[in-house]
């Protein structure tokens, strides 16, 4: 809930940040961690289900991208020939649609992360984080079109959510068992 509120607030105050130091500082603080928080939460609740991946996420991405493409052509009068053609514009995420695109990619890696975490324990989680950070750093060396670099840049946060889930579940169970006595 807090993450959603911060995203909405951040997008709202973005247009008012110039000239107001408090608003600008608030915007910077929100932007510093809100996407990382979303990615960690996405990893914490992730479940691998190929059918849902296709019927929900892929479908939502394709419909959203098609609507955005129509908006860009009709309202913004964008010339797609300058950016690689209509097919490239349709396949590559535009602006905020990148998160749906990222979730599809990240969910495809979920079985590997879960196998590392479940079979190798803490060592597997450390290895999974090292691989995720390595992928993000390596992908940062490539000049990706549009916002694709975000898919890789935020991947370690998603992996962190996936890899830390058992520890957080154990912590929640421990806290539930050791509640203070209420009078």
Describe every region a protein language model picked out.
Residues 1-48, 57-66:
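Functionally critical transmembrane alpha-helices in membrane proteins and complexes, commonly lining
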Residues 3-12, 73-75, 94-99, 154-155, ...:
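Hydrophobic alpha-helical transmembrane segments
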Residues 7, 40, 46-47, 69, ...:
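Hydrophobic alpha-helical segments of integral membrane proteins
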Residues 9-12, 16, 44-47, 51, ...:
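Structural signature of transmembrane alpha-helix termini at the membrane-water interface
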Residues 22-35, 87-102, 140-157, 183:
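Interfacial loop-to-helix transition and helix-capping segments at the boundaries
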Residues 35-45, 98-110, 155-163:
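Hydrophobic cores of alpha-helical transmembrane segments in multi-pass inner/ER membrane proteins
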Residues 56-110, 124, 128-141:
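Membrane-interface helix-loop-helix regions
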Residues 90, 114-183:
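Aromatic-enriched alpha-helical transmembrane segments of multi-pass intramembrane proteins
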